[in-house]
Amino acid sequence: MQRWAKRLLLGTMGAATLFLLAYGLFWPRAESVMGEVQGGARVVVIDPGHGGEDGGATGVSGTREAELNLDISLRLRDLLSLAGCRTRMVRQTDTAVYTGPCASISEKKVSDLKNRVRLVNETPQALLVSIHQNFFSEGRYDGAQVFYAATPGSAGLAERAQQALRDALDPDNRRACKRAASVYLMEKIHCTGILVECGFLSNYAEEQR
């Protein structure tokens, strides 16, 4: 893995521990929530964005977003498991999660998204963390950013996650967390959920660090 990917990975893993700790310590009914997370009653659903034919964004040096999302997510799962958290992966290989006869890429993407939503919503006591990489037509943008669902607890969790990413990865990052408007997965889930854009694949300087 390239150095920049390792840097993003370590920052994301550290942030995961921090935001879950913050969620447990400072949210209402803190002792109950933290006990549920560490005891395994709460399930952290980890969603590596894209997969299979849908590679997501492609970095300036050819890095596929889907593969990087999966690598980060698998390591995040391992870290959270070591911390006593119960996890569930949306996917564990570089494959999409569509089902049924899908004749086109568009149909596969629709099926894939619906299956992700169903998996999250059928998981009792779920807390969703969706992992993605950002991309923009201009290469000057950088930094991680957290987006949140409209469900209870999501905005507060996103704020703490954004701060944790800033502390662990990029002290100069001044990006603010935002509502994930028009993101199908985040609009359809019923549980607390955030989407983490770990960095910009379109930023060559960030990639080379």
Which role does the model predict for each range below?
Residues 1-209:
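Catalytic-site microenvironment of enzymes
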